[in-house]
Amino acid sequence: MSIVIGNLLTDLPEATLAEVFQPIVERDGVRIERIVSHGQATPEGEWYDQEWDEWVLLLSGQAQILIEGETHPRVLKIGDHLLLTAHCRHRVEWTAPDTPTLWLAVHWKIS
């Protein structure tokens, strides 16, 4: 048995030029990762349309997520979480430009 210990809130990478995706665990169709954003948004006209479910928890910063078919983005603040089922088209409209936005994301695919 091995044990891995870390702290999601420390040693944040520089993310002012691009989002940083850092895998924490990958096992049998499940991936847990830390995402660090700093003012990024999904490019205009692009949508995420994933083959897997994704649950995200906002640990710091703020973000706005637009779900296809909705007229206004959902505002996420520290502690908010969101479940995006497979093929739920969505886009990140905004992340805080003045502070890192830190996400914990869990991805899984049911066969």
Segments the model singles out, each with a brief description of its role:
Residues M1-W47:
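A short, N-terminal "cap"/entry segment at the start of jelly-roll beta-barrel domains
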Residues K77, A86-S111:
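Ligand-binding loop in jelly-roll beta-barrel domains
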Residues G29, E70, P97-T99:
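Short strand-connecting beta-turns/loops that link adjacent beta-strands
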